[in-house]
């Protein structure tokens, strides 16, 4: 999975390595891994509870709270490390012609290692504090792509 790949040793904040008990505990409900419920009826993934990755920007195991907008979109690009581009389609009204035109916007979002995201998947993202210069959203749920629809196709409302 996402083991130690950085130069500095990665560890979860708030979880120390020196424990009084000598028996080994596996990560999970009784183990020494920090995870939380983000609320808003989003379940914590099993990989976040039982996994061994360390991500301080993960909403389930890191120091990030979800507040503000909850949006849905289609994954356009997943080439960046732990970051995806989400395409949101919408209709814009033109008063002169009394008609709507199709428009879209691209939103960069942080994706936790507990999710397996591919291009074309539908994701639910939640707003959080600024994680970098452009990233202000975090992936909360992934809905796998059902059919062979393209990633640039306009989805209905």
Curated annotation (Swiss-Prot):
| Keyword RNA-binding belongs to the record | yes
Question: Span of the secretion signal?
Answer: none
Example of a GO cellular component annotation carried by this entry: cytosolic small ribosomal subunit
Origin organism is: Dunaliella tertiolecta
The entry sums up its family as follows: Belongs to the universal ribosomal protein uS17 family.
- InterPro entries, alphabetized: NA-bd_OB-fold (IPR012340), Ribosomal_uS17 (IPR000266), Ribosomal_uS17_arc/euk (IPR028333), Ribosomal_uS17_CS (IPR019979), Ribosomal_uS17_N (IPR032440)
GO MF entries: rRNA binding; structural constituent of ribosome
Q: Does the keyword Flavoprotein apply?
A: no
SUPFAM superfamilies, A to Z: Nucleic acid-binding proteins (SSF50249)
Q: Which Gene3D superfamilies match?
A: 2.40.50.1000
Record-given protein name:
Small ribosomal subunit protein uS17
Could you name the domain of life of the organism this protein comes from?
A: Eukaryota
Could you tell me the keywords of this UniProt record?
Answer: Ribonucleoprotein, Ribosomal protein, RNA-binding, rRNA-binding
Report any one BP term from Gene Ontology: translation
